[in-house]
Amino acid sequence: RRENRTSESIFGYCTYEGGYFDVKYMTKEYLRQAADQGSEPTRNSFVKSRVLFSSDPEIEELVARIPVFQEKERDEKMLSFYSDLYMSYDYFWKACRPEGYMKIRTASEIVYCIYRLILQENRVLFPCNRRLEETVAGLENKPEGIVELCRQFCEEQTDELAEKIMSLYASWTTYDWTKDPGQFYTQYCRDFEQWWLYPRPLLAEW
């Protein structure tokens, strides 16, 4: 840590062309914290992990606890992601009529929230943004055609497509999205304006 080299890529030893070893050095305390309160990308990074050697009998148990969907966080995450979706669509997209950067940002946030909500309803860990869309596409339980529609929306960014996406998700989900809008606004403020008050990962990586 003193040299800021706890992560590195090692080339030249992998058994397939273009391959490399993605190395991250972790302490036992890191593993314990990841098992107790790790973010979903952290937990997902341990999927299919194996302990090849350890003189510490606790390591294997700690590693096994990490790549597990956290049911206790599900309700709060559903509220947070739906609140973000609600504000992104109803306020930023429909009321603010964004252009340029903000239009791209809002469109991607709408898609991001829908994808994260679908993962939560399936109790599937969020891997990372790079793998998010392919993970959702691989699920059987999802709104029919949602990935194709979201990709089209990201490219064209029209009101008609935004409305179609929202309607498709609303007709599929089992989440109670008919709550008082004030609850969604309150949660949005907590997640985006007051996040520094609470010991929790930012919504984008939670």
Q: What does each model-found stretch correspond to?
A:
Residues 7-99, 200-205:
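Conserved NTP/Mg2+-binding pocket subregion across the NTase superfamily
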Residues 1, 6-7:
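Extreme N-terminal leader/anchor segments
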Residues 67-206:
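Conserved nucleotidyltransferase catalytic core and NTase-mimicking acidic/glycine-rich helix/loop elements
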